[in-house]
Amino acid sequence: MSHTVKIYDTCIGCTQCVRACPTDVLEMVPWDGCKAQQIASSPRTEDCVGCKRCETACPTDFLSIRVYLGAETTRSMGLAY
């Protein structure tokens, strides 16, 4: 089952999510929108196992990263009945 990893622009570029990911789904890329000048990116979502360690590791109060598991992806996008 595929999962969707969504990175929000509230990311502070701390790299906690990247270090927490056991399958190297995430990486940091250059971005001018925060003081750290980088933001998390999820180029390999097909490797996501849905453990949500990245969410747990995120130090922001507004969870800059979310993992939507299988059917949850459909619901979150308003595609379910």
From Swiss-Prot:
Superkingdom of the source species: Bacteria
Cellular component per GO, a single term: photosystem I
Domain 4Fe-4S ferredoxin-type: from-to ranges: 2-31, 39-68
Subcellular location, record wording: Cellular thylakoid membrane
Family annotation (InterPro entries): 4Fe4S_Fe-S-bd, 4Fe4S_Fe_S_CS, PSI_iron-sulfur_center, PSI_PsaC
EC number: 1.97.1.12
Subunit structure: The cyanobacterial PSI reaction center is composed of one copy each of PsaA,B,C,D,E,F,I,J,K,L,M and X, and forms trimeric complexes.
Protein name per Swiss-Prot or TrEMBL: Photosystem I iron-sulfur center
